[in-house]
Amino acid sequence: MPNEFVSVLAAVGTIAVIGLAVKFYNSWRSDKKKKSPILLVEPVVKYSLPLIKKDILSHDTRKFRFALPTSDHILGLPIGQHVHLTVKIGDEVVIRSYTPVSSDDDHGYVDLVIKVYFKNVHPKFPEGGKMSQYLENLKIGETVDFRGPSGRLVYKGHGKFSIKILRKDPPVEYNVKKIVMLAGGTGITPMLQLIRAIIKDSTDETQASLLFANQTEKDILLRDELDDIAKNHPNKLKLWYTIDTSSENWPYSTGFINADMIKDHLFPPSPDTIVLMCGPPPMINFACNPNLDKLGYDPKLRFAY
């Protein structure tokens, strides 16, 4: 038997084995996910989850890990949705919404990255953030009530969005090829949730361009992961930063989001491009929407978390 023929047979055999292995893995992963018990079955039910780990990411940012009921459990949160955390501080019930940075590929726990707003730091908010300071002081083993899924947007993959204009409205389906993302501060978490879903699916050709605004360079949350995704998946993510105060060697933009930043670094308006925004209300109302209007982005193809 000629050597060339033997080589061809060997190559074909190797490809077949790899193909079967990939098929088996995908089937196993799908079956595992189907069999995994889901925590968030009823959106109105509260589930008490214990804190099992806290990582310090920066001077004011923490990653909190809460345990699910068993090591097999998944949270069961659709892409685009968030959870509500409820705590009682004195006589006051405090509720805040967060998007986890973990996903349903993670079993047994849920991770939240949260910026802590300390007392006596911002002159307009001398008391700081009630929920974030409560979580900062939470001890390992103590519990917080989770509720969800919640939210008006769900990403179904391959550029398909299901969005409710108002909370009680029926969802409207959108099919797009590109996503313009405008995020400020902790508003990056729902964007990262969506970006992760897109890059995880090799068949999802949806492209995202992200403009991420912060006060200073050290305030940029999850920067290492964002930079890594942009470097390794340039066909799926275009990334740009802007900060209020910059150093001499800062290679990105400085200042509030403006029309030039959007025009130079994000996808232009088109019928197959949707705009997603998440950040402080002044950013959305005074920096994002007026400049999107100026550049001709369709208001019907915009969504603010």
Segments and roles (model prediction):
Residues 141, 145-159, 167:
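Aromatic-rich membrane-interfacial microdomains
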Residues 97-108, 156-182, 291:
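Short, compositionally biased
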Residues 100, 188-202:
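Histidine-anchored nucleotide/phosphate-binding helix
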Residues 185-190, 280-283:
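Gly/Ser/Thr-rich loops at beta-strand to alpha-helix junctions
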Residues 176, 200-208:
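Conserved S-adenosyl-L-methionine
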Residues 35-147, 214-216, 244-245:
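Ferredoxin-reductase
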Residues 19-39:
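Transmembrane-helix exit/juxtamembrane "anchor" motif
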